[in-house]
Amino acid sequence: MPGFYEIVIKVPSDLDGHLPGISDSFVNWVAEKEWELPPDSDMDLNLIEQAPLTVAEKLQRDFLTEWRRVSKAPEALFFVQFEKGESYFHMHVLVETTGVKSMVLGRFLSQIREKLIQRIYRGIEPTLPNWFAVTKTRNGAGGGNKVVDECYIPNYLLPKTQPELQWAWTNMEQYLSACLNLTERKRLVAQHLTHVSQTQEQNKENQNPNSDAPVIRSKTSARYMELVGWLVDKGITSEKQWIQEDQASYISFNAASNSRSQIKAALDNAGKIMSLTKTAPDYLVGQQPVEDISSNRIYKILELNGYDPQYAASVFLGWATKKFGKRNTIWLFGPATTGKTNIAEAIAHTVPFYGCVNWTNENFPFNDCVDKMVIWWEEGKMTAKVVESAKAILGGSKVRVDQKCKSSAQIDPTPVIVTSNTNMCAVIDGNSTTFEHQQPLQDRMFKFELTRRLDHDFGKVTKQEVKDFFRWAKDHVVEVEHEFYVKKGGAKKRPAPSDADISEPKRVRESVAQPSTSDAEASINYADRYQNKCSRHVGMNLMLFPCRQCERMNQNSNICFTHGQKDCLECFPVSESQPVSVVKKAYQKLCYIHHIMGKVPDACTACDLVNVDLDDCIFEQ
């Protein structure tokens, strides 16, 4: 692994105060330069001070040119990072030690320092205190030139973020994409910490064979890396979880002041590693195979509601591993006390990071869902304001959401579990409910209907039961159909008996014997019964069952309103042998239509209503 010298160069930000008497051409050169970020950068250009950056870029370019000249190593590795400190802007310049020994480093740096003053500052030395200095092994006199290895970059420089981080340059292949990309920086830092933790784990010394918890050792770095690795494996993100997992380990790290200071930093680093390198199945799937799953509470709830536990477990496992693509959500639907919240709560608390949807805050409903392993939507409703973002999240798409008092953040594909006793596919907009998004929402969900109420002493699902259930699912995977409603039953057909097991059927007793065909009554043809037929049976010559509409049309009061006659041949055709009788009525009063037309109709229902005779009413008192 190559070694690097570190030179810290302070950059003037106040030209009048730090460079008294500097020319106007220098000021114009600094002020006119405009910087733009490369396309692959996710940094905020508004947080970058462009005037000091112009000077810093010129300083690092001329410094590296002179370094290659004195070291006679044109391909020497370097990493330069420009930062905004509390008092001054400064650069960390890491240059490979190849070609320059420590005893002559001061001589060469003095020459480079003078070159920078003459070429860049026009002969005016900055008034910044100790503006050009090499890092020493210790402060004060007597310290040697410090040589750092490549781990210094991911340990100290890469974790820097804006606004402290301003810019970076390098010719090292592994860090080219991370110079101006904060996401790549986080990934490399997490990868480095994981690698170091695994290395320390492999080289454990004096480890207690009866416990996998870390203990205090003589080497601080080894102890710290061992601690971080153990926290990551156990999914511990807080001191409370640490105490619950291993109380002796937590107390041992609080015994000394130097180890006590590592607790918060170790938990923070472990959280970063877990969020970047781990997924939900790493903590949901148990390590040991399960022999008897029948006592598992999740198994009992699914079986109680008519689901095949093996098929349902495969749905849960595929959901956690994100193997169903767009169908990224499990919806547990049912009334209260059916176990839906019991299951969802246990799954959410088994992973180190889970987020809850705050559907009551329509402005920032997904504020808590960034960088999580599982998203839990508890007893909510789908509103018109959040439905589009919700469809993207439920479908496992990358989407940016607004956060309170922060800039928008991206939610990566994350498994979602929904619990509700209302229709989550109906979109509520004010006082109206629409179903235009019902099919897209159903295409993103697996729906479990839990309708059986649990006993009051059923108990809570534990983390270990969740891990055992997912482990059992992994060992008994079956093919899952991509459908909204998870099929129930799952009962397997019994195999057909062998020939030896088939016995002769018993003789039927005469008292319960079925009548023969000859004894059965002849079927009735209702087509002969109806003179008028409805539009459904108008062309039928054989009707095995009665029709309510045909019955109504063959009552005495049934008259064709269009032609004023019964048994209308045009509307309800019958055989030619049956005559059509026309019913003619005499009206004293006419309805307003026939009154205007001046024509007396043969039959009219409106005229019947005008000429009602109470003597003919069967309900007359």
Curated annotation (Swiss-Prot):
Residues 308-463 form the SF3 helicase domain. InterPro entries: Helicase_SF3_DNA-vir, NS1-Nuc, P-loop_NTPase, Parvovirus_NS1_helicase, PV_NS1-NUC. The active site is at Y156 (for nuclease activity). Its cofactor is a divalent metal cation. Residues 196-211 have a biased composition (Polar residues). It is found in: Host nucleus. Pfam families: Parvo_NS1 (PF01057), Rep_N (PF08724). It comes from the Viruses. A motif (RCR-2) lies at residues 90-92. Gene3D superfamilies: 1.10.10.950, 3.40.1310.20, P-loop containing nucleotide triphosphate hydrolases. This is Protein Rep78. It comes from Adeno-associated virus 2 (isolate Srivastava/1982). GO terms for biological process: DNA replication; symbiont-mediated arrest of host cell cycle during G2/M transition; symbiont-mediated perturbation of host cell cycle G1/S transition checkpoint; viral DNA genome replication.
